[in-house]
Amino acid sequence: MGGISIWQLLIIALIVVLLFGTKKLRSLGGDLGGAVKGFKNAMSSEDEKKAIEDTSAEKTAQTEEKKTESKDKEQA
């Protein structure tokens, strides 16, 4: 009673197609798909950058550890 039925959705879809035309709707869909794809690529590249920064920080910490160990051995 309070919800939208399938027939009402079909009528709304038909009106939208009549107003904008299939070419316009197709181009809008393509633009939306391209935007989603760009967003996903940006998110994955951000994750890769973060992973690279994490590994480089770990390598730096390991190098510093080795330096301090070798200095301690030399002093002993």
From Swiss-Prot:
Pfam family, one: TatA_B_E
GO molecular function: protein transmembrane transporter activity
Gene Ontology annotations of biological process type: protein transport by the Tat complex
Positions with biased composition (Basic and acidic residues): 46-76
Subcellular location: Cell inner membrane
Keyword Transport among UniProt keywords: yes
Topology versus the membrane: Single-pass membrane protein
UniProt keyword list: Cell inner membrane, Cell membrane, Membrane, Protein transport, Translocation, Transmembrane, Transmembrane helix, Transport
Transmembrane spans: 1-21
Gene3D superfamilies given in the database record: 1.20.5.3310
Main location: membrane
Region described as Disordered: 43-76
Cellular component aspect of the GO annotation: TAT protein transport complex
InterPro entries the record matches: TatA/B/E (IPR003369), TatA/E (IPR006312)
Keyword Disulfide bond: no
Assigned protein family: Belongs to the TatA/E family.
Role this protein plays: Part of the twin-arginine translocation (Tat) system that transports large folded proteins containing a characteristic twin-arginine motif in their signal peptide across membranes. TatA could form the protein-conducting channel of the Tat system.
Record text on subunit structure and interactions: The Tat system comprises two distinct complexes: a TatABC complex, containing multiple copies of TatA, TatB and TatC subunits, and a separate TatA complex, containing only TatA subunits. Substrates initially bind to the TatABC complex, which probably triggers association of the separate TatA complex to form the active translocon.
PANTHER family for the chain: SEC-INDEPENDENT PROTEIN TRANSLOCASE PROTEIN TATA
The protein, known as: Sec-independent protein translocase protein TatA
Phylogenetic placement of the source organism: Bacteria, Pseudomonadati, Pseudomonadota, Gammaproteobacteria, Alteromonadales
Gene from which this protein is expressed: tatA
